């Protein structure tokens, strides 16, 4: 099996780590039939790829076999943001497979994170909708669903192009990432309405970039900080600033 090296996967602070643990738990409550999960947003740069990568890591740490499929064929950020490199001579990805240039086994990469696999885009394309709606998409999604416990699909922003809605046809559930103080209720409602037209079940939203200082009382905030620092001691020592992908 081909391999990918994830060079940058930053440590999370206590609050962020607990948030992803809660997200993973809530997904499990949605039922055993929810195996393929589409992650999208209304706008670009709301943190959907950041959410995908950390959900991948969290679920993998829970001994789930997880694969992340990068379906943002026009403007993928995962490879560059997380310093992901191919190991070996072949650099095939989703775009190559959908175009008939390689086979399914050529694009599923094992990573250096235990229990985590990835399907990269391979190359950016302009005709992304044409590729995603090809007859090769359904067999790929069915195979991934059969071989993995969870399939995470990093889709483009649903409010900008229709690729996310196309991919939703092949997914059991969807998460909408919303950046705090950026998304309007009307815009988010439009995304939910578009996804709901498919058979994909909208599981909920993920609120990202929240500044808890802006609405948490001073006394409660300090108590929360002391509680968090107790558990952070000894394992959280980030060396780089956190990069949030698209």
Q: Model-derived features: where do they sit?
A:
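P-loop NTP-binding module
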Residues: 1-246
């Amino acid at each position: 099996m081909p391999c990918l090296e994830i060079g940058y996967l930053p440590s999370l602070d206590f609050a962020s780590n607990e948030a992803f643990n809660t997200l993973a738990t809530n997904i499990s409550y949605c039922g055993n039939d929810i195996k393929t999960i589409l992650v999208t947003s209304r706008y670009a740069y709301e943190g959907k790829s950041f959410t995908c990568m950390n959900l991948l890591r969290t679920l993998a740490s829970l001994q789930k076999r997880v694969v992340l499929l990068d379906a943002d064929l026009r403007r993928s950020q995962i490879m560059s943001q997380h310093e992901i490199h191919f190991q070996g001579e072949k650099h095939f990805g989703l775009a190559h497979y959908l175009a008939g240039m390689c086979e399914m086994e050529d694009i599923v990469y094992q990573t250096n994170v235990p229990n985590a696999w990835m399907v990269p885009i391979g190359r950016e394309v302009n005709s992304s909708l044409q590729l995603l709606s090809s007859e090769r998409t359904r067999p790929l999604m069915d195979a991934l669903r059969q071989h993995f416990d969870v399939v995470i699909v990093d889709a483009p922003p649903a409010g900008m192009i229709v690729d996310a809605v196309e991919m939703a046809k092949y997914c059991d559930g969807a998460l909408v990432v919303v950046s705090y103080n950026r998304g309007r209720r009307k815009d988010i409602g439009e995304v939910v309405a578009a996804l709901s037209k498919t058979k994909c079940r909208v599981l909920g939203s993920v609120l990202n970039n929240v500044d808890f200082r802006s609405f948490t009382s001073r006394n409660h905030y300090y108590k929360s900080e002391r509680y968090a620092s107790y558990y952070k001691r000894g394992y959280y020592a980030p060396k780089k600033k956190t990069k949030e992908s698209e």
